Amino acid sequence: MMITRWLFSTNHKDIGTLYMIFGAWAGMVGTALSLLIRAELSQPGALLGDDQIYNVVVTAHAFVMIFFMVMPIMIGGFGNWLIPLMIGAPDMAFPRMNNMSFWLLPPSLLLLLASSGVEAGAGTGWTVYPPLAGNLAHAGASVDLTIFSLHLAGVSSILGAINFITTVINMKPPTMTQYQTPLFIWSVLVTAVLLLLSLPVLAAGITMLLTDRNLNTTFFDPAGGGDPILYQHLFWFFGHPEVYILILPGFGMISHIVAYYSGKKEPFGYMGMVWAMMAIGLLGFIVWAHHMFTVGMDVDTRAYFTSATMIIAIPTGVKVFSWLATLHGGVTKWDTPLLWALGFIFLFTVGGLTGIVLANSSLDIILHDTYYVVAHFHYVLSMGAVFAIMGGLVHWFPLMTGYTLHNTWTKIHFGVMFTGVNLTFFPQHFLGLAGMPRRYSDYPDAYTLWNTVSSIGSLISLIAVIMFMFILWEAFSAKREVLIVEMTTTNVEWLHGCPPPHHTYEEPAFVQAPR
C-alpha cells in the first residue's frame, strides 16, 4: 500500500506532497551550506580550508537552493496541489509523467552531492564557466557529475513544464476561458513556457562543456577556434529566464494571498496582472547579456541590454502597485500569510531597485562580481521567493493537511525570519559599494564589521528555520482541525474540505458560460 501510493503515485496531491517534503529537506541542506559560507566570512582568516573548498560550498548552495528547494516547492509542490483544484481538473494531464518528473530529482540531488565528494569538488560557481570548468582547472569527475545532475533536473523540469502547459490549456471546463482562471494558474503557465524554451539551451551548453572536457572538442577553447564567451551567452540565455522562473509562481501566490486577506473577491487589475506576467516572461528572454557587461561587448550592445533590462521594471511595477491597490480599502485580516505577503512586496521592491542600479552597464562594470550583486539577488530570492513560499505554506497548510498552524508561533517566526534575512543581506550592499568581491573565502580587515553583522544575521535566520520545523511538528501534534474556510466561491481550491478527498472532480465541474 505505502509503495504503490508513494513510489508509483499518479495522484497530483500525493506528488505535490512529495515535492514539498523533498524541497523542505533540500532547503535544510542549502541552509546548512549557506551557514558554512557565513561562518567562513564571519571574520578575516581561513576557517574551512582553501578557496576551492569554499567555492564548492558556494556552488552547491546555489544549485541546491535553486533546483532542489525553490523550484520543487513552488512549481512541483504548490503547482501540483493547486492547479487541478483551481481549474476543476481530476488530475494533471499526464499523471505518470508527473511521477517521473518528481523521481528524477532525488538522483539528480545525489549526483550533485557526489560531485562535491569526489576529487576536489566543483568549485566553479553555479555558472560553471569554462575555462575554470574545463578539464585542466577541474580535472576529475566533479564537474561531469554536476553536469549530469543538471541534465536530470532539466529533464524533470521540461517534462513538468509540458505537463503544466497541457493541463492548464486543455483540462479546464469547456466553457471556461483562459481569462477566467486564477492568477496562480497564469503564473505557472508562464513559468512552464519559460522552462520549456530556456532549459534546452542550457542542456546544449553543458553538453558542449561535457564534450570539451572529455572528447577533445573545442567549443569553448580558443586554441581550437572556440570561444568561452559562447558558453556565457548560452548559459545566461537560460540563466536569466531561470530567475524569473523562480519568482513568477511566487507572484501568483502573493496575488492570491493579498486578495484573500484583504477580503476582496478578486485582485485589483486582473488583466493587467496577466499581461504583466506575460510581458515579464517575454522580456526575460531578451536581456540575458546584462550578466556579461564586463566581457567586452560593443557599446551599442550594452546600451540595448541596459534599456531592455530597465523596461522589465514597468510590468513589475504594474504588479507591485496592483497588489497595493488590492490591499486598499479592504477588510484586512492580519493573519501570518498577509505578513509574509507584505514583507514580500516591500523587500522584493528593494531588490528590484538595486536591480535597476545594476542594469546600468557603466555602473555594473564597477559593481559586477561584488557583494552588491549578491545583496541584490538575495533580496529578490531569499526575501522574494522564500517569503512567497512561506506565505503560501502558512496559507494553504490547512488545505493540504487539514490542520491549522499555531497563529502566534507563525507570527513570531515571521518576525525572526524578517530580522535575520535583512540583517544578513542589507550590509552586503555596503560591502559591494566598498568593492568587496564575490567568491573569495577571505578579505581585507576593512570589510570585517559588515561581514560580522551579516554572519550574525545568518544565525538569526537559522533560528527561524528551526522554529519553523517546530511549528510544523506542533501543528501535526496538536491536530487543530479546520472549522470553516471563508470566501470559497472565489477560492475554489477550498471547496472540497480540508484536506480534500484523494480524488476530486471525478465528474466535470459545471461552469456557467459568461452571458
Swiss-Prot record:
Annotated heme a3 binding sites: H376
Major subcellular site: mitochondrion
SUPFAM superfamilies: Cytochrome c oxidase subunit I-like
Membrane topology: Multi-pass membrane protein
Cited InterPro entries: Cyt_c_oxase-like_su1_dom, Cyt_c_oxase-like_su1_sf, Cyt_C_Oxase_1, Cyt_c_Oxase_su1_BS, Cyt_c_oxase_su1_dom
Mitochondrial matrix compartment residues: 1-11, 87-94, 171-182, 262-269, 328-335, 401-406, 479-515
Mitochondrial intermembrane compartment segments: 41-50, 118-140, 213-227, 287-298, 358-370, 434-446
Keyword annotations: Calcium, Copper, Electron transport, Heme, Iron, Magnesium, Membrane, Metal-binding, Mitochondrion, Mitochondrion inner membrane, Respiratory chain, Sodium, Translocase, Transmembrane, Transmembrane helix, Transport
Residues holding Fe(II)-heme a: H61, H378
Disulphide connectivity of cysteines: none
Gene Ontology molecular function terms on file: cytochrome-c oxidase activity; heme binding; metal ion binding
Location of this chain's protein in the cell: Mitochondrion inner membrane
Function (record text): Component of the cytochrome c oxidase, the last enzyme in the mitochondrial electron transport chain which drives oxidative phosphorylation. The respiratory chain contains 3 multisubunit complexes succinate dehydrogenase (complex II, CII), ubiquinol-cytochrome c oxidoreductase (cytochrome b-c1 complex, complex III, CIII) and cytochrome c oxidase (complex IV, CIV), that cooperate to transfer electrons derived from NADH and succinate to molecular oxygen, creating an electrochemical gradient over the inner membrane that drives transmembrane transport and the ATP synthase.
Subunit structure: Component of the cytochrome c oxidase (complex IV, CIV), a multisubunit enzyme composed of 14 subunits. The complex is composed of a catalytic core of 3 subunits MT-CO1, MT-CO2 and MT-CO3, encoded in the mitochondrial DNA, and 11 supernumerary subunits COX4I, COX5A, COX5B, COX6A, COX6B, COX6C, COX7A, COX7B, COX7C, COX8 and NDUFA4, which are encoded in the nuclear genome.
Protein name listed in UniProt: Cytochrome c oxidase subunit 1
Organism: Latimeria chalumnae
Encoding gene (name): MT-CO1
